[in-house]
């Protein structure tokens, strides 16, 4: 679950919904949204992620919002004076994946001031992203996307690198002969086949290379 505490702008909630659905998440929980709920401005900025908004649940307290969860993380951009383990978004995502069927949630604070300590106390662990120490500010949807993407990519099997080719068919012999003729003309024009005694063997070798391919 993605839990937004005291979200101020409907537009931000909509962008959070968009970030969530990008990564396959739909459980959005709102604690005391400032402008009430539902909010038409959220739908406008969700860019089609209305499913998340329609299923969003509203709570009066953070305690109510996390009451059914087994594992809760609190996000913050600064150190807090409390004894809690601090993990990176990557580690948090791995731990959420590892607990399997248990219910997990991530807390995000208000846009202007972040999260109060009384809310962080409810979390099992704190998540701090290792960003530029001189500037760690993220907007709400950026913070959600950062965590959601780390969770999503652990179950994604997309290769890290690939060359995508258009649909092709094997070349006909006629097409291969035309290719050879064009290639040999170009090689001749650049002097690559200038040694007449070696030319037949070189042409034969070049054709064999393409025929094997």
Q: How should these model regions be labeled?
A:
Residues 1-213:
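Post-transcriptional modification and biogenesis factors for structured RNAs
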């Amino acid at each position: 679950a993605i839990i937004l505490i005291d979200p101020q702008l409907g537009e931000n909630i909509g962008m959070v919904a968009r970030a969530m659905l990008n990564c396959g998440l739909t459980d959005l929980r709102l604690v005391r949204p400032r402008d009430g709920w539902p909010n038409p401005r959220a739908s406008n900025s969700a860019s089609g992620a209305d499913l998340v908004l329609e299923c969003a649940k509203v709570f009066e307290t953070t305690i109510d919002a996390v009451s059914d969860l087994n594992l809760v993380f609190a996000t913050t951009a600064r150190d807090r004076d409390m004894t809690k383990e601090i993990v990176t978004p990557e580690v948090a995502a791995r731990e959420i994946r590892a607990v399997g069927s248990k219910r997990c949630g991530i807390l995000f604070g208000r846009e202007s001031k972040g999260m109060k300590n009384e809310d962080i106390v409810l979390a099992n662990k704190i998540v701090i992203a290792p960003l530029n120490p001189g500037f760690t500010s993220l907007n709400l949807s950026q913070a959600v996307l950062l965590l959601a993407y780390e969770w999503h990519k652990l179950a994604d099997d997309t290769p890290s690198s690939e060359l995508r080719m258009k649909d092709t068919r094997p070349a006909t012999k006629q097409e291969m002969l035309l290719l050879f003729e064009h290639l040999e003309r170009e090689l001749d024009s650049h002097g690559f086949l200038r040694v007449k005694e070696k030319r037949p063997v070189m042409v034969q070798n070049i054709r064999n290379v393409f025929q094997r391919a």
